[in-house]
Design a protein with these regions (language model features):
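Sec-dependent bacterial lipoprotein signal peptides
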Residues: 1-18
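A short beta-turn/strand-edge loop motif at beta-sheet boundaries
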Residues: 24, 39-44
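Intrinsically disordered, low-complexity segments enriched in polar/charged residues with Gly/Pro
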Residues: 20, 35-37, 58, 70-71
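Extracytoplasmic cysteine-anchoring/structural motifs
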Residues: 18-25, 72-157
Length: 157
């Protein structure tokens, strides 16, 4: 009887100790950025659209009041091209951002598909409305923290 109780208790403890990992909740790899002007965080008053390249898919469509962005990076390319289009009532301006990166395969568990983490190696832009871009965190993974500080030209420029 004692042996049977020990066996049942060990089975119960084993079942309780198992962790259920839901892959769909925790597997978004995103490159996060925030807009700054004159060293202060700002929101864009006008409409922002972001596409992957000139004729690529739309990553962000007609967003208004945008202060932060979540960019999906490509899986195997060493450099991604993103076109940011800002449209106001009487103007339209585009700036292109190139993000050079390395890609690392990341394996979480047998139940989850492999994902790719990235390491940002450099960022440049065409400087149409973006003054500069600082990489504040080069590692792009599951953590939802800012990777890029996108500095816009000051209002006086």
């Amino acid at each position: 009887m004692r042996r049977r109780l020990l066996y049942i208790a060990s089975i119960v403890l084993l079942l309780v100790a198992c962790e259920s990992y839901d892959c769909t909740l925790y597997n978004h790899v995103g490159c996060y950025g925030a807009f700054y002007q004159d060293s202060a965080s700002v929101s864009l008053d006008d409409t922002l659209t972001i596409t992957a390249g000139k004729s690529g898919p739309v990553l962000l469509n007609k967003s208004v009041g945008t202060s932060k962005i979540d960019l999906s990076l490509s899986y195997w390319q060493d450099e991604d091209t993103l076109v940011l289009t800002v449209k106001g009532t009487d103007y339209l301006v585009q700036d292109t951002i190139w993000i050079s990166k390395s890609n690392q395969v990341h394996y979480e568990s047998p139940d989850c598909p492999a994902t790719l983490f990235h390491t940002i190696q450099g960022v440049r832009s065409t400087h149409e409305f973006i003054d500069s871009i600082n990489v504040i965190r080069s590692s792009v993974n599951y953590e939802q923290t800012n990777n890029l500080q996108i500095h816009l030209f000051s209002a006086a420029d």
